[in-house]
Curated annotation (Swiss-Prot):
Disulfide-bond pairs as recorded: 31-78, 33-68, 61-79
Signal peptide: 1-19
Gene3D superfamilies: Anthopleurin-A
A cellular component term, taken from the record's GO annotations: nematocyst
Residue ranges of the TM segments: none
Annotated propeptide span(s): 20-25
Entry protein name: Delta-actitoxin-Aeq2d
Record flagged with keyword Secreted: yes
Organism: Actinia equina (Beadlet anemone)
Keywords of this entry: Cleavage on pair of basic residues, Disulfide bond, Ion channel impairing toxin, Nematocyst, Neurotoxin, Secreted, Signal, Toxin, Voltage-gated sodium channel impairing toxin
Compartmental location: Secreted; Nematocyst
InterPro entries: Myo_ane_neurotoxin_sf (IPR023355)
The protein's role, per its UniProt record: Binds specifically to voltage-gated sodium channels (Nav), thereby delaying their inactivation during signal transduction. Causes death to crabs.
Length: 81
């Protein structure tokens, strides 16, 4: 069970977008922004999950991005460019 949790966590970390990537809008783990409204079928997720790191400040979003989620996560935030 512990190995499975480590593998899942590693997969999430590797799937997250990097702020230096050229195709940043096409990569990362999607999340629900407030502007997306309620989530009926067919509604798109327009945000991207960013892990909170020291370089991004308190909101967890990189430069040029803003927080768009309903609530802040412990280790990550939903951000939109």
């Amino acid at each position: 069970m512990n190995r499975l949790m480590i593998l899942v966590f590693a997969a999430v970390i590797l799937a997250l977008a990097s702020a230096d990537d050229v195709d940043i809008a096409k990569r990362g783990v999607p999340c629900l922004c407030v502007s997306d409204g309620p989530r009926p079928r067919g509604n798109n997720l327009s945000g991207t999950i960013w892990m909170k790191t020291g370089g991004y400040g308190g909101n967890g979003c990189p430069k040029g991005w803003h927080f768009c989620g309903k609530s802040r996560g412990l280790l990550s935030d939903c951000c939109k460019q």
